[in-house]
Structure formats: C-alpha cells, structure tokens
Swiss-Prot record:
Presence of keyword Transit peptide: no
Binding annotation for (6R)-5,10-methylene-5,6,7,8-tetrahydrofolate: 183, 282
Record note on quaternary structure: Homodimer.
Pathway: Pyrimidine metabolism; dTTP biosynthesis
Source organism phylogeny: Bacteria, Pseudomonadati, Pseudomonadota, Gammaproteobacteria, Pasteurellales
Encoding gene (name): thyA
Organism expressing this protein natively: Histophilus somni (strain 2336)
Pfam entry (one): Thymidylat_synt
Protein name as catalogued: Thymidylate synthase
Record carries keyword Methyltransferase: yes
Amino acid sequence: MRQYLNLCQRIIDQGHWVENERTGKRCLTVINADLTYDVANNQFPLITTRKSYWKAAIAEFLGYIRGYDNAADFRKLGTKTWDANANENQAWLNNPVRKGTDDMGRVYGVQGRRWRKPNGETVDQLRKIVNNLSKGIDDRGEILTFFNPGEIDLGCLRPCMHTHTFSLLGDTLYLTSYQRSCDVPLGLNFNQIQVFTFLALMAQITGKKAGQAYHKIINAHIYEDQFELMRDVQLKREPFPLPRLEINPDIKTLEDLETWVTMDDFKVIGYQCHEAIKYPFSV
C-alpha cells in the first residue's frame, strides 16, 4: 500500500525527535497525515510489506460496537489487545473506580453506546447514526465519538482513534475518522483495517453503497527502537496488490453485530505479503 509507505518515508525524512514521557522513549514525529481507503472497490488496506494480522483489529472494533468494557469479552471475540491496559497499567490499577480484573472502565465503546448525560441518562450515539442513515438522513452530525474529557479518569486509556463522522451523498456512504496519535509501524496497520471495515459494515447494515473512508492522523510517529527496522527493512520492500475483504451478507442489522457475528463472518481474499517484522511495542 503505497500511501502507507509514503507516510513512513515522510517520517524518516522529515520527522522531528520528540521525547515521550509515558514510554520513556523518543519518537520520530510528523504532524498531520491523511490516508484514503477505497471501500467502494474493496481495496482492503492490509499491509503487504510485512506479514500482518487482521482478525484482532476487526474483533476489537466489533467489541467497541457492542460497547464492551471488559478485556475478557474482547478475548472471547478473538483479541487480547486490552489485556495489558486493563491489567498491567499501574495508574489504572491504582484507580479506585477500577472494578477488578479485566475491567477497562468507561472507554471507547462504552462512550459510543452509553455516553452519560448530566441527569444520569445515557446516549446511544451509534444507534442514532444507524437509524438516521437507514432512513437516508444525514443531519451533518452523524458523529460517533469516544473522547469524553469529563470521564478520561474513569477508564484505563484515552482513545487514540477517537471520532468517526459519517456522510451521505445520494445513496453512497462516506466515513471520516480522526486519530490523535498513531504508532505507525504497529498501530496504523490495525487502525486502517478498522476504518475500512467500519464503513463497509455500516454501509451494509444501512442499505447504502460504501464510498471512500478518510483517515486523519494528528501525531504520526515511529519509536526510536522501531526506526532501523522501518528504514532498513520494511521500506526496502515492494508492496503487493491489496487483497479484498469479504463480509457475510447475512449481517443486515446493528442487532446482528451486537449478537451473533464472529470472526468467521469475515474473510480476506488474495493476501500476499513479505516476511513478518517484529517491531517493539511500547505500552
């Protein structure tokens, strides 16, 4: 995927070294990156210049759609992505609101499905969007946001990819996703799969055609212990053609996504890739 490699090269060539207090590492950083995914023509943005794993990314976002707040529920879907943040983040372990093992608090999907109002009632942002789009309504506010400044301290992690805005032009559905921070060698592969799949699913359950998905990243970075692998290995490889994503056509409603859908309902067709690269992960 050439636009991904172009961003990596831009960071290598133009990035500024920034100290990251949370991880104790330096990051080579650029501000503002824009990526576009062709969902209409099913050009699935799975990185081909190293072996990439897509199921955990879709499983995680399915957990957000369901409003999960417990790492055990994510494991049942097929992803362990929340194990460390729920159980090994010392600040969260010391937080008195934490309910115990695997509790994530009010993060991501909790905000998307149960945003709290001052009177104690909750707002289901996703349901409102699905209802409107199914009726052909775009009120220019079809926005799903996971970023709630008033409840940051009630969860184990601030959202990185935090807001998703849907737009209708005729019967074609578009998505613009916003991300405050991105570990490009590791996280971006995960996030671009989620952006693509979210639009594909929402188009399918609302009866619309999928258009383009736009992904805006504010702070795009490569950690210092990832730098040489990116510069000397991954950027030396030629990408293969992008694969396709097949989604079970029996998925027709939000209730389907909430109840019976599993990773068996997704298939990637025609994926070719280079050998795996083991990038260090920063917690």
